[in-house]
């Protein structure tokens, strides 16, 4: 692309030479770009002489969490119950060692599992941090969950009694029966459940049950599907006083996929636990096929498929909107034409000094807006398929959030990524972040359109650049017509399984590095080239 090396050199020089002054300058109000400065050449070096601007005000977290009165800051004690069945016990038979193992996985600061696990020829490094590490990182140290581990509780029935699906392919009744039995057992042991309650609710009541989960073993519908829900429970104290409680619980399985010896990673637990914190699902909760071919967030969000990053051993970190929804960060609004830059999302924002990890583009509708954030392959984001500027659209509806049906309409998704390559397939996400090849802008007229719901922001984003750990971009109301994104031409690619059945059709500018739909042997064809790939 013309002038790219020249621009990057100028940008690097600008960033290095002004580093000592940048903090003070960021405190200055931003200046609008006069029409005379707007470029006719998108690579005009004059663009980079503009100083970073400060936006109008910080947007406060709104009503986006699905639960209220949940403690999300400070040190919070959470119950973690280990429960087995009369026909399925934990792989670790010694109760003391079992509790000791989960104590490390859930509470130990800096915990790392050095093991490499293998399934079907694919190797997965062990977890890169404890559950406590994960949530302290996502909250920038504001939320410190400490898990009080109890168990194992020996349930009276076999796993199928609690996991058997009903006519709607649901097992929620059986799961609630399991949680009720666990509560009865805890009460019989003398535990004061009311002591964990706040305003009549026991928050973050978590269960790890022995064995496998139906989420990765659909051939056995009697297994329990990991989930989160609420149970009404009556607790009687030592004086036999009746105390009604709401048990807000989550549950997840012990074992990894269909194995008998490999422990499950922390991804599924973090996903379900995040429900109890107030986050909904971002995948299509009605159609798995649509959730794959027309993904909302895919591997980019823990509340979509990101809980399975690295097989679930290294779940993806929260997006800016997820952090924002739980009150762990504010997102500055873009209010001026000018040059903006972002640190990566894993770094704590410091608005007073002008350090931001995300920006918000407002529309005329308060419930519809765009979020811009910088993602690097580091920490809990290390297994990302790409690095750069992530652009997501929010179209908030209280009913959709509370009903957990945000993205069931593929043509009207409520929270989703706007992929740079305009390809929403879950497994072709290497082209989702900006810049991607020549695509370094996203506008209200381009492809994909910079749009949230039916509303457009006042600004377009262009000249997106990556420089070391920073992302820089220009925001402007008056976009030159020749800065619009070109439509992706790319190459048509068809992927077949070993039986010759087409399993994926897509268009990409990088056919040699296409993401495949799961593990196995595939035949990939594009143009006159046919390749056999084992994944």
In which residue ranges do the predicted regions lie?
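Bacterial N-terminal signal peptides that target proteins for export
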Residues: 1-8
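Hydrophobic h-region of N-terminal signal peptides that target proteins for export
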Residues: 12-21
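Non-catalytic C-terminal accessory/binding modules of secreted extracellular proteins
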Residues: 23-39, 91-125, 133-140, 219-259, ...
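Primarily auto-inhibitory N-terminal propeptides
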Residues: 23-105
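Active-site-proximal segments of metallohydrolase catalytic domains
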Residues: 61-70, 120-245
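A domain-level signal for the mature, folded cores of soluble proteins
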Residues: 157-173, 258-263, 276, 280-359
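Active-site recognition of the HExxH zinc-binding catalytic motif
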Residues: 267-282, 372
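C-terminal outer-membrane/trafficking sorting elements
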Residues: 481-535
């Amino acid at each position: 692309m013309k002038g790219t090396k020249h621009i990057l050199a100028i940008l690097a020089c600008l960033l290095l030479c002004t580093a000592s002054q940048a903090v003070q300058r960021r405190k200055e109000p931003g200046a609008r770009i006069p029409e005379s400065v707007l470029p006719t050449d998108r690579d005009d070096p004059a663009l980079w002489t503009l100083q970073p601007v400060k936006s109008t005000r910080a947007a406060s977290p709104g009503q986006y969490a699905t639960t209220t009165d949940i403690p999300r800051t400070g040190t919070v004690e959470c119950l973690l119950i280990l429960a087995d069945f009369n026909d399925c016990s934990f792989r670790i038979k010694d109760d003391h060692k079992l509790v000791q193992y989960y104590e490390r996985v859930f509470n130990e600061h800096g915990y790392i599992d050095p093991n490499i696990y293998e399934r079907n020829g694919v190797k997965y490094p062990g977890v890169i941090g404890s559950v406590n590490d994960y949530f302290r990182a996502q909250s920038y140290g504001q939320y410190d969950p400490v898990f009080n581990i109890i168990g194992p509780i020996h349930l009276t029935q076999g796993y199928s009694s609690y996991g058997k699906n009903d006519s709607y392919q649901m097992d929620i009744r059986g799961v609630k029966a399991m949680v009720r039995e666990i509560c009865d057992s805890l009460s019989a042991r003398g535990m004061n459940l009311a002591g964990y309650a706040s305003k009549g609710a026991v928050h973050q009541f978590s269960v790890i049950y022995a064995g496998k989960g139906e989420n990765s073993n659909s051939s056995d519908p009697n297994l329990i599907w990991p989930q989160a829900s609420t149970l009404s429970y009556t607790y009687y104290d030592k004086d036999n006083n009746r105390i009604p409680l709401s048990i807000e619980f989550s549950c997840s399985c012990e074992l990894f996929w269909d194995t008998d010896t490999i422990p499950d990673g922390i991804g599924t637990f973090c996903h379900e636990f995040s429900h109890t914190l107030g986050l909904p699902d971002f995948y299509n909760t009605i159609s798995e096929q649509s959730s794959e071919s027309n993904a909302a967030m895919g591997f980019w969000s823990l509340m979509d498929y990101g809980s399975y990053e690295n097989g679930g051993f290294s779940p993806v970190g929260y997006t800016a909107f997820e952090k924002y929804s739980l009150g762990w960060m504010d997102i500055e609004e873009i209010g001026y034409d000018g040059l903006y830059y972002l640190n990566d999302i894993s770094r704590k924002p410091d608005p007073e000094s002008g350090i931001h990890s995300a920006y918000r583009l407002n529309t005329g509708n308060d419930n519809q807006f765009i979020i811009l954030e910088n993602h690097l392959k580091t920490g809990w984001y290390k297994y990302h398929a790409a690095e750069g500027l992530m652009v997501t659209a929010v179209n908030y509806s209280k009913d959709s959030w509370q009903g957990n049906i945000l993205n069931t309409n593929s043509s009207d998704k409520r929270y989703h990524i706007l992929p740079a390559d305009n390809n929403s397939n879950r497994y072709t996400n290497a082209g989702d972040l900006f810049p991607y090849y020549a695509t370094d802008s996203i506008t209200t007229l381009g492809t994909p359109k910079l749009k949230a719901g039916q509303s457009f922001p006042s600004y377009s984003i262009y000249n997106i650049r990556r420089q070391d750990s920073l992302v820089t971009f220009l925001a402007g109301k008056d976009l030159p017509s020749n800065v619009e994104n070109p439509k992706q031409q790319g190459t048509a690619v068809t992927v077949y399984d070993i039986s010759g059945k087409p399993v994926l059709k897509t268009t990409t500018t990088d056919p040699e590095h296409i993401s495949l739909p799961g593990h196995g042997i595939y035949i990939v064809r594009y143009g006159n080239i046919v390749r056999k790939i084992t994944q």
